[in-house]
Amino acid sequence: MKRALISVSDKNGIVPFAEKLVELGVEIISTGGTKAAFEQAGVPVTGIEEVTEFPEMLDGRVKTLHPAIHGGLLARRDTAEHMEAIAAHDIKPIDLVVVNLYPFQETIQKSGVTLEEAIENIDIGGPSMLRSAAKNYAAVTVVVDTADYDTVLTELEEHGATTFETRQRLAAKVFRHTAAYDALIAEYLTNITGETFPEKVTLTYNRKQVLRYGENPHQDAAFYTEPGTVENSISSAKQLHGKELSYNNIRDADAALKIASEFTEPVAVAVKHMNPCGVGVGENIEEAYLKAYEADETSIFGGIVALNKEVDAKTAEHMSKIFLEIIIAPSFSEEAFAILAKKKNIRLLTVPFAGSVKGFEKTSVNGGLLIQASDSVIEDTASYEVVTEKQPTEAEMKALIAQWKIVKHVKSNAIVVGSDKQTLGIGAGQMNRIGSALIALKQAGEKAKGAVLASDAFFPMDDTVEAAAKAGITAIIQPGGSIKDKESIEMANKYGISMVLTHVRHFKH
């Protein structure tokens, strides 16, 4: 290895790396700020303009886009015609490229960033050099990640060159990196133009964690996250205590957070297998947790609990009495953390909360991807329609709205029975609506008397209304829209219960 081209925005570790290269007899070529850093540190360096014999121009937009650079990168060392061609133009081969790109992601995440600032942080020369070097990895070593500095130096010291396997691995990393970089730029500009579903979608995610296994032990898995901070998201969670999250932990935590984000008042949400088993609302977080626990004392065992307010010592004392896999909250008081951290296996996570989840959801199918807007429609309760002779009381309406927020997060067919403070029975995932209703009503038992019922979609028959009325339900909320709505309304009138139509369906598959 004789010549290296180094141009980095992240200068961590670059000076000692370059110093070692010089010790190994490698000539360093560099640009702009990187060259200045080397000169300040006393590292011998050749300016890019000395190689290209052309000055930087257009405020630095053009400096490495030159045949003297790309010819030196792309020339095949095993092809005589290539080597003769670059020699005829006095172009020398470049054996190592170390480049990381302008911080586009960090720039667009800054508050108040302008389009001009974003555009100026789109790197052109860097990706071009990386791609040229990576294409010719048979002869050229290319580094885009500071974590690979040591590997390159070790191989150079031991063998005088990098191995083919290392060059191939680094080239693959480069193409992943530049593809992700371009995808982020494309997404940013697409969002500005307002296109919702462009003809091509390229997504970029960063690996956060290799998981022990997936949904089952025989399935390999990893957790990838979107670039940047996504509020209300398990991807942005900070783990304070406990062992690593599992695949199922992550999915359940995501489900719990989505429900907790629906409420502004203190709420506690217990989830098992991506369905809520208990949701409690209170004047404070202790009351909310106790309501969630009382909703289903059996199913909460081994569950995930998400709370939208800080966990205090009193709440922590209650929670420490049973086995919970995960507790997620915006924060934990010092006393609460000390209480819960005594249990070594419990996972304690903090997540920034900021209202209900918005944006788009992505679901993979065999050979494709479904993208839809999140089910975060803002519903105007003033547009809800009371269709029965009996009007819901103020207390019933409060309870209906609370359960309506919850039922949309339950797997369809979904029925939730509850009050304004807690769920009392949850029927999820049955192939017919009456099946889910009977499960929810059975779970609620005697507590169904005076409670309300929420359904994520319309009633195809009047049987659910009749079952609810016989169990003591006093009010029902549902979207409406069935050709048999009239029969359901008549059944509600027969038993003297109120029914509210929202005209918004909340299927969840």
Swiss-Prot record:
Pathway: Purine metabolism; IMP biosynthesis via de novo pathway; 5-formamido-1-(5-phospho-D-ribosyl)imidazole-4-carboxamide from 5-amino-1-(5-phospho-D-ribosyl)imidazole-4-carboxamide (10-formyl THF route): step 1/1; Purine metabolism; IMP biosynthesis via de novo pathway; IMP from 5-formamido-1-(5-phospho-D-ribosyl)imidazole-4-carboxamide: step 1/1. One of its GO terms (biological process) is 'de novo' IMP biosynthetic process. Keywords: Hydrolase, Multifunctional enzyme, Purine biosynthesis, Transferase. InterPro entries: AICAR_Tfase_dup_dom_sf, Cytidine_deaminase-like, MGS-like_dom, MGS-like_dom_sf, PurH-like. Transmembrane segments: none annotated. The keyword ATP-binding does not apply. One of its GO terms (cellular component) is cytosol. One of its GO terms (molecular function) is IMP cyclohydrolase activity. Its EC number is 2.1.2.3, 3.5.4.10. It catalyses: (6R)-10-formyltetrahydrofolate + 5-amino-1-(5-phospho-beta-D-ribosyl)imidazole-4-carboxamide = 5-formamido-1-(5-phospho-D-ribosyl)imidazole-4-carboxamide + (6S)-5,6,7,8-tetrahydrofolate; IMP + H2O = 5-formamido-1-(5-phospho-D-ribosyl)imidazole-4-carboxamide. Residues 1-144 form the MGS-like domain. It comes from the Bacteria. PANTHER family: BIFUNCTIONAL PURINE BIOSYNTHESIS PROTEIN ATIC, BIFUNCTIONAL PURINE BIOSYNTHESIS PROTEIN PURH. Belongs to the PurH family. This is Bifunctional purine biosynthesis protein PurH. It comes from Listeria monocytogenes serotype 4b (strain F2365).
